[in-house]
From Swiss-Prot:
SMART domains: DnaJ. The keyword Secreted does not apply. The gene is DPH4. It comes from the Eukaryota. Residues 15-88 form the J domain. GO terms for biological process: protein histidyl modification to diphthamide. This is Diphthamide biosynthesis protein 4.
């Protein structure tokens, strides 16, 4: 791995780019990045082969075939890569504080109760400072997917800003907060 990509201390926290030992910037410069990704995939398989791993430096980080294959699949698909890059930007520490801090550049924290609900479209929404009145928009199904975490990260439809929506799932029979895998606008 190059020194710029060895920022990960373990195979569990490595990005797909680190697994394949390539950079996003390199892929962005390619008209068709598929051959480059495939070459990186084959190199990663050879570098992390079990026969070679057993004889190498124990302090080195090695990746599994599953990690390498997942990296190939995500980075080879343009739509999956765009979604992955967006998720990386949100999860990386930025600005004055990291993931555990209260401030991240381009990410605003709000409570679900502070958002408007459109009955006709059955979605929550909020305007963005870029001017779009419905720039942050999501539905009940989006909340259900992340009900265990209690937060949903939504990107603006028109710019690069993000909204982290915090919520709690309430039991229908009680007003107490209950861990649940179902969410409804009436329960929230």
């Amino acid at each position: 791995m190059t020194s710029s990509q060895s920022i990960s201390s373990s195979a569990d926290t490595a990005t797909h780019y680190q697994v394949l030992n390539i950079t996003s910037a390199l892929l962005d410069t390619q008209h068709d990045s598929t051959p480059l990704i495939k070459r990186a995939y084959h190199r990663a398989l050879l570098r992390n082969h079990p026969d070679k791993v057993a004889n190498s430096d124990p302090s080195s980080v090695f990746f599994t075939v599953d990690q390498i294959t997942t990296a190939l699949n995500v980075l080879s698909s343009p739509s999956a890569r765009v979604a992955y890059d967006a998720a990386l930007r949100v999860s990386r520490p930025t600005g004055a504080a990291g993931r555990d801090g209260s401030f991240q550049t381009g990410v605003e924290n709000v409570d679900l109760d502070d958002l408007a609900f459109d009955e006709d479209q059955e979605c929550w929404y909020r305007p963005c400072r870029c001017g779009n009145e419905h720039s942050y928009e999501f539905r009940e199904a989006d909340l259900e997917e992340v009900s265990e975490e209690g937060e949903l990260v939504v990107g603006c439809l028109d710019c690069s800003l993000w909204l982290r929506v915090h919520f709690a799932v309430l039991d229908e029979n009680e007003d107490d907060v209950q861990p649940s895998s179902t969410t409804s606008k009436d329960k929230i």
